[in-house]
Curated annotation (Swiss-Prot):
GO cellular component term, pick one: mitochondrion
Record's protein name: Altered inheritance of mitochondria protein 41, mitochondrial
The keyword Mitochondrion is annotated on this UniProt entry: yes
Family stated for the protein in its record: Belongs to the AIM41 family.
Membrane-spanning ranges: none
């Protein structure tokens, strides 16, 4: 029996029916698609605040992609971008409040909450979870080898395994090690 299959994006069409293929899309690309869908919904609902915030997020992500062409992007990249946008909003809010512009501060606060919801949806460990794991790692290292210089601590870390198991970026783990090292050693 001959079947006519035609590829249509991530789907195959067979006699007018779509068959979804098992895709291996990364979380990064799924998150971008989710942002674009949310942008479309905001445009249809005429929600200007959500629309401009999501456009700003997509623009920042695209600029990051252009700046770092050969870099692999993942959920940790999105975490960094979202965190940067949140910090910008916090700075703007404090500046607006200093200048008695509560209306603009309120708008920035709403944008911050929206970006925070996207940040919370990322499958990464919280800073508190990372700090707890780093403390345990450093205590185990101290028990095994005694006092270890900080430069040697970094060489004892298996970065590929640790970033996947802990669901944390290398930079997040490094900053946690630096802050916790002083307390343990």
């Amino acid at each position: 029996m001959n079947f006519m299959l035609r590829r249509n994006g991530g789907q195959f069409q067979k006699f007018g029916f779509f068959i979804r293929c098992n895709s291996t899309e990364s979380f990064y690309s799924k998150a971008i698609l989710g942002l674009k869908k949310d942008l479309k919904q905001a445009m249809l609902a005429k929600d200007d605040l959500k629309k401009t915030t999501i456009r700003n997020m997509l623009s920042t992500i695209k600029n990051k992609e252009i700046d770092a062409k050969d870099t692999k992007f993942d959920e940790f990249t999105l975490f960094g971008i979202y965190s940067k946008l949140i910090n910008q909003r916090k700075d703007s809010i404090s500046d607006y409040l200093k200048n008695n512009r509560e209306d603009l501060a309120g708008k920035e606060e709403q944008e911050l909450k929206l970006i925070q919801t996207y940040l919370d949806s990322l499958p990464i460990a919280s800073p508190q979870e990372i700090d707890t794991k780093v403390e345990k790692f450093l205590n185990d290292l101290k028990e095994k080898e005694g006092t270890v210089p900080m430069k040697d601590v970094f060489s004892k870390v298996d970065w590929n395994t640790l970033t996947k198991e802990w669901k944390a970026s290398q930079s997040m783990i490094k900053s946690s090690i630096v802050s916790k090292y002083k307390n343990i050693f």
